Amino acid sequence: MLSPKRTKFRKAHKGRIHGTAKGNTQLNFGQFGLKALEPERITARQIESARRAITRQMKRAGRVWIRIFPDLPVSTKPAEVRMGSGKGAPEYWVARVQPGRIMFEIDGVAEGIAREALKLGAAKLPIKTKIVTRIGEA
């Protein structure tokens, strides 16, 4: 699963996801992509699950680019622990995704296979998405 090799700080604030994506809204690598339509935190496990679904559907032909990276640590406290006594330990990593952000790109496969693969990948994610192409949006 994806996670940073090292970070400046061990823990981070929860924060909010405001507005739409400023960059990474266009396809840069592949012919087809998966664009986010809602703001959400996507976990490293969800990214990996979507990646596996996409690659399996493509029968390992073509190429997949993951355009988001989980760089935000999420900390949790153990079950049945009283309030207070500090923030919990970092448990997993998430990527903040804004609407309009391209999350996955694929190339080297036919359009029908690409659409099916991205549809299966989108089913693994907790947000509404849209399949985009170089020619236009679909």
Swiss-Prot record:
One of its GO terms (cellular component) is cytosolic large ribosomal subunit. The keyword tRNA-binding applies. Part of the 50S ribosomal subunit. It comes from the Bacteria. GO terms for biological process: translation. Belongs to the universal ribosomal protein uL16 family. Pfam families: Ribosomal_L16 (PF00252). Disulfide bonds: none annotated. Keywords: Ribonucleoprotein, Ribosomal protein, RNA-binding, rRNA-binding, tRNA-binding. This is Large ribosomal subunit protein uL16. Binds 23S rRNA and is also seen to make contacts with the A and possibly P site tRNAs. GO terms for molecular function: rRNA binding; structural constituent of ribosome; tRNA binding.
